[in-house]
């Protein structure tokens, strides 16, 4: 009776003029199309849930605040967000709640190798530790933080909420 849509890829930064059709379509296939398939195929199961169905969609900080070099990723996450919002409207009558989380960078995942972290921090003239905490609260957001929020969103606290979009980013100045 719960589904977390977390399928996604973040390709290396590429400006629009350098983005190939193959790269664009791959990102859309993973970040959008696969999640549409999962939603569609699980609808009967979610609808039959004893109490109510729950879906949490992993969006991105890039929906409200995209960055240069992330056109395919940002567009795919924006489209996924709209898909989730429409599903919340359409499936509410089936007692299915659909909400989204929009994390900023979560550094304890496989995407963020020590080399990538060092490069990004150097690009902004920061240490790696400062880069990880580059938000209003000066706190690193971890995969555990995101998982705990998702667990809450599948619980009683969110039983009467659908279509919500919750940032988990330590307070991103570009989003606030």
Task: Identify the meaning behind each predicted range.
Residues 10-13, 158, 162-176:
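Short C-terminal tail/terminal secondary-structure segment
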Residues 92, 97, 161-163:
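Short, small/polar-rich loop/turn modules that mediate ligand/substrate recognition or access, typified
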Residues 16-17, 65-71, 93, 138, ...:
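Active-site loop immediately N-terminal to the catalytic Tyr-X3-Lys motif
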Residues 39, 76, 84:
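Active-site helix of classical SDR
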Residues 14-16, 23-28, 117:
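Substrate-binding pocket helix/loop in short-chain dehydrogenase/reductase
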Residues 60:
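Residue(s) in the substrate-gating loop at a strand-loop-helix junction
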Residues 44, 89-90, 159:
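Alpha-helical segment proximal to the catalytic Tyr-Lys
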């Amino acid at each position: 009776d719960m589904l977390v849509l977390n399928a996604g890829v973040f390709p290396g930064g590429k400006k629009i003029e350098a983005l190939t059709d193959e790269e664009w379509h791959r990102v859309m296939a993973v970040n959008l199309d696969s999640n549409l398939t999962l939603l569609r195929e699980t609808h009967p199961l979610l609808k039959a849930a004893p109490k109510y169905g729950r879906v949490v969609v992993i969006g991105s900080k890039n929906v409200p605040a995209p960055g240069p070099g992330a056109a395919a990723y940002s567009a795919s996450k924006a489209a996924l967000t709209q898909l989730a919002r429409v599903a919340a409207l359409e499936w509410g009558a089936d007692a299915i709640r659909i909400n989204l989380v929009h994390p900023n960078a979560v550094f304890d995942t496989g995407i963020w190798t020590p080399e990538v972290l060092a490069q990004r921090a150097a690009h902004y003239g920061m240490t790696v530790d400062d880069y990880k905490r580059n938000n209003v609260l000066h706190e690193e957001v971890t995969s555990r933080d995101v998982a705990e929020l998702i667990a809450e969103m599948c619980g009683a606290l969110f039983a009467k909420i659908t279509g919500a979009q919750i940032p988990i980013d330590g307070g991103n100045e570009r989003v606030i």
